[in-house]
């Protein structure tokens, strides 16, 4: 399993605009083969939001980024002024996972 993170530096005062954009998103990724989950993390002490997507494998993620659904989901990008810096994109392979035991 892999986790793809996209850290987005949101300009001060534009947090609501950023969050509303995700509330109204097209919800197309959920139907992609290999997709597991999406998480959007609000910062507590910084201005970087983090969008995490979990995938069965890198090939599934790459297929998403090359799909017509991806293009549709990203066609109404927010205005550049909503961001105060470049985004930081990373991909990680999960090598260990733990959850609370029932």
Label every model-predicted segment.
Residues 2, 39-46, 75-102:
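Glycine-rich beta-strand-turn "strand-cap" elements at beta-sheet edges
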Residues 2-8, 39-67:
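Short, well-ordered beta-strand segments in beta-rich or mixed alpha/beta enzyme
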Residues 6, 13, 32, 97-98:
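Compositionally biased, intrinsically disordered low-complexity segments
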Residues 10-19:
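Short, surface-exposed ligand-recognition loops at beta-strand->loop->(often short) alpha-helix junctions
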Residues 16, 59-61, 97:
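Residue-level signal for secondary-structure boundary sites
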Residues 22, 26:
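Short amphipathic alpha-helical/adjacent loop interface patches that line ligand
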Residues 27-36, 54-88:
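An amphipathic, aromatic/His-enriched active-site/gating alpha helix that lines ligand/cofactor pockets
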């Amino acid at each position: 399993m892999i986790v793809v993170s996209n850290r987005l530096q949101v300009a001060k005062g534009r947090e609501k605009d950023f969050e509303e954009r995700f509330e109204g998103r097209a919800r197309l990724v959920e139907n992609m083969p290999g997709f597991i989950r999406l998480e959007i993390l609000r910062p507590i002490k910084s201005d970087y939001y983090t969008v995490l997507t979990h995938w069965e494998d890198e090939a599934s993620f790459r297929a998403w980024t090359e799909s017509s659904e991806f293009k549709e989901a990203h066609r109404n990008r927010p205005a550049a002024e909503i961001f105060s810096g470049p985004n930081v994109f990373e991909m990680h392979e999960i090598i260990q996972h733990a959850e609370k035991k029932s």
